[in-house]
């Protein structure tokens, strides 16, 4: 339901072309306050997502459905079209969305296959980056686009950048030329 406002991603779910299962790490919180974060061990600013609730959440995902585990992280490899195409070929993908200052390094070291960044800027949480990743990957799944060849000529496919100006054929005449 959360993806309803996401247009194409929601439509792809409704058509059963993709399946998105959300896991709430607060269900694996360590206390009655649903705490999933803690101050960094050794000091420092901000809060870090704790290892225990994250590990429990990962382990609660059916092993056969877990697949490749990606952590959306500003320290990760910058996402590009080649990576999108590679990830689109995977049967299952688990995306960990960080918050605060990040997640406990033990989770990264023992469970994460890959860290991915969508750019050199800060977001409130990894959910926004995950949505970008899901949308870009799902465009490459058969049946998601009206024209199956559309993604072959996308801006970044095969090193292409749009090399022409784009116009529509409507008769808008507002003195625009």
What do the PLM-derived regions correspond to, one by one?
Residues 1-10, 167-177:
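Single conserved hydrophobic/aromatic residue that forms the stacking wall/gate
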Residues 21-23, 70, 93-95, 114-116:
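Hydrophobic/aromatic beta-strand patches that form the interior of the parallel beta-sheet core
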Residues 107-149, 154:
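Structured adenosyl-cofactor binding patch, chiefly the S-adenosyl-L-methionine
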Residues 156-169:
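Long, charged alpha-helical interface segments
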Residues 100-108:
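Short, glycine/polar-rich helix-capping loops at beta-to-alpha or helix-loop-helix junctions
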Residues 25, 72-75, 97-100, 119, ...:
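Fold-independent oxyanion-binding glycine-rich loops
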Residues 4-61:
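N-terminal nucleotide/polyanion-binding subdomain common to many enzyme families
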Residues 48-97:
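S-adenosyl-L-methionine/SAH cofactor-binding core of RNA-modifying enzymes
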């Amino acid at each position: 339901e959360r993806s309803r406002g996401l247009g194409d991603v929601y439509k792809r779910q409704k058509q059963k072309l993709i399946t998105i299962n959300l896991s709430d790490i607060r269900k694996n919180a360590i206390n009655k306050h649903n705490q999933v974060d803690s101050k960094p061990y050794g000091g420092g600013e901000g809060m870090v997502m704790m290892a225990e609730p994250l590990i429990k959440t990962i382990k609660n995902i059916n092993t056969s459905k877990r697949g490749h585990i990606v952590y959306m992280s500003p320290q990760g490899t910058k996402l590009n079209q080649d990576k999108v195409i590679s990830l689109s070929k995977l049967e299952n993908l688990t995306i960990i969305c960080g918050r605060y200052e990040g997640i406990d390094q033990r989770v990264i070291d023992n469970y994460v296959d890959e860290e991915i960044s969508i750019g050199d800027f800060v977001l409130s949480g990894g959910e926004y980056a995950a949505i970008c990743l899901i949308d870009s990957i799902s465009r490459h799944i058969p049946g998601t686009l009206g024209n199956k060849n559309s993604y072959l000529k996308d801006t970044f496919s095969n090193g292409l950048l749009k090399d022409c100006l784009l116009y529509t054929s409507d008769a808008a005449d507002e003195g625009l030329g």
